[in-house]
A protein has these predicted regions:
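N-terminal Lys/Arg-rich, disordered targeting/topogenic segments
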Residues: 12-22
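Long, charge-dense tracts
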Residues: 129-153, 185
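Long, structured ligand/cofactor-binding scaffold of large enzymes
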Residues: 152-155, 162
């Protein structure tokens, strides 16, 4: 079979049917009495309670009888979690360093013309930076008042354990429709223990209701998930494709018809969903977020029951000091603990195997990017020549389909390794639809009396591409700097 998850029955079979036989003991968190809870309460500037991690100092008062003030400064899990601040690892295509993706791929700014991602798109750092990096992103704008700015509060949904805390006193509809800046003084903790662990037992738990809701709509219950399944589902809470529903901006996962790129596209089409209208081509486009969980399930590791934990949080230490490393990062940074837990080849061979998959996917990704970029530019040219809505209808549909496939593959972290065959298939489909769109545009131009090649702008650098799509980056950066200096606490 193709390995695709295209129906409700496939979803049930995948979730309930396959488990990894681990090569090491799994009774870790509960048996280690040194693993205790993570938080003490502190009062924010608004006077409301907010979670804050105990700092690494000896002058913090600790009440071991109070679950709000239990010390886990010395646990291996907590200490390794703090290492998510490390930014020294770099692999062939990624790592935990903050690279400017737009500078590396100027065409992406044309693909996102009219959308905030054309302003700023950096590779992700560790969980420790989840709040800081959102502050600094040009995509969140420069709101100088709590009720201003371009983004909704829903953009905080996966950035902090403070969101589940706020949802205990405020319903999602009320919370998410607020402005992003309005929750700024409440969101103080980066992604951490409380996002995945129940404080009393340290067992795994769901803290994002939108994943529970998506499961329920497919006739499944999170409560029935096995421990092994939970080791991926806690990650899937945030590492999945999502969208904002309606004016209330309720965050939801589009899994109603399945997990594949076609399933999710069909769902979005059925509700007439669009993230943005392209500034050049006028196509109504969907912006993929990070369909990591979806694509992971379509690769051999996901199909064999391997969880996210085995490769991104491997067991380290020996005997009573054995624990799962909470310095979540690329498996390539610790091949001896990840790949070699199951595979007996050398680190060099295993790394080469990963890079070979990535290079092959990267090659076709660049083909799609080039064709799709030209298609948007040519579509604008056709509009400028007087094309009608009727003439461009099929072009716009093909552009929507092509860009969704490209973005689904590119936005997913680790897709080229998680599911190389499926990602290659998706990109191949995207290339086909991009080419079809360009052919249709040429036909439209011929009808309008134009039979020459469409002139292409110079978008060879980030600055040139942003200038071409009409962005005033100097003004954007100045506004952001003022925001950081006057609004964000130093």
């Amino acid at each position: 079979g193709s390995g695709l998850v295209g129906s409700e029955m496939c979803i049930r079979d995948r979730i309930k049917g396959k488990h990894l036989k681990a090569h090491y003991k799994t009774s870790i968190a509960i048996s280690l009495i040194v693993i205790i809870v993570l938080v003490i309460l502190r009062t924010t500037v608004t006077g409301q309670d907010s979670i804050k991690f105990i700092d690494d100092t000896d002058d913090q008062p600790i009440d071991q009888q109070n679950s709000d003030s239990i010390d886990l400064r010395y646990s291996n899990e907590y200490q390794s979690w703090k290492q998510t601040s490390d930014t020294t690892f770099r692999s062939l295509f990624n790592g935990n360093q903050q690279a400017d993706i737009l500078a590396e791929h100027p065409g992406m700014m044309v693909l996102w013309a009219g959308y905030a991602f054309s302003k700023d798109y950096l590779s992700p750092r560790g969980h420790m930076y989840s709040i800081e990096d959102l502050y600094k992103s040009l995509r969140t704008g420069a709101p100088m008042t709590p009720t201003s700015g371009p983004q909704p509060a829903a953009c905080w949904a996966c950035k902090s354990p403070d969101i589940p805390r706020l949802l205990t006193t405020t319903d999602a509809k009320t919370l998410y429709k607020k402005k992003w800046a309005e929750l700024g003084n409440e969101i103080v903790n980066p992604i951490g223990c409380a996002d995945c662990h129940e404080p009393q037992s340290m067992g795994l738990r769901m803290t994002r209701s939108f994943l529970k809701s998506a499961y329920k709509r497919n006739g499944l219950r999170i409560e029935d998930a096995t421990e092994q399944e939970m080791r991926s589902l806690v990650c899937a809470q945030c590492h999945a494709e999502y969208y904002f529903q309606g004016e209330d901006r309720i965050l939801a996962l589009p899994w109603d018809q399945g997990y594949t790129v076609e399933n999710i596209e069909a769902y979005y089409d059925s509700i007439n969903f669009t993230d943005f209208t392209h500034k050049l081509s006028r196509a109504h486009l969907i912006k993929a977020q990070h369909p990591d969980f979806e694509l992971f399930q379509m690769g051999i590791h996901g199909q064999r029951g391997v969880s996210c934990r085995e490769c991104h949080m491997p067991a380290v230490g020996e005997d009573e000091n054995r624990y799962n490393n909470h310095h979540i990062k690329s498996p390539l940074a610790m091949i001896d603990r990840t790949c070699q837990a199951c595979h007996r080849e050398s680190e060099e061979i295993l790394r080469k195997d990963v890079y070979e998959r990535q290079n092959k996917v990267y090659a076709i990704r660049m083909r799609v990017e080039e064709e799709l970029t030209k298609a948007h530019i040519e579509a604008k040219f056709a509009w400028d020549k007087g094309a009608t809505e009727s003439q461009m209808k099929n072009v716009l549909k093909l552009l929507r389909q092509a860009q969704w496939r490209w973005d689904f593959a590119v936005a997913s972290h680790g897709a080229a390794f998680h599911a190389p065959q499926e990602v290659t298939r998706i990109l191949g489909s995207g290339l086909d639809k991009s080419t079809q769109a360009r052919i249709q545009i040429m036909k439209v131009l011929a009808q309008l009396g134009y039979t020459q090649d469409v002139p292409m702008p110079d978008i060879s650098t980030k600055a040139k591409a942003q200038q071409y799509i009409g962005l005033d980056m100097e003004a954007e950066q100045q506004a952001k700097q003022k925001f950081l200096e006057t609004v964000i606490p130093q």
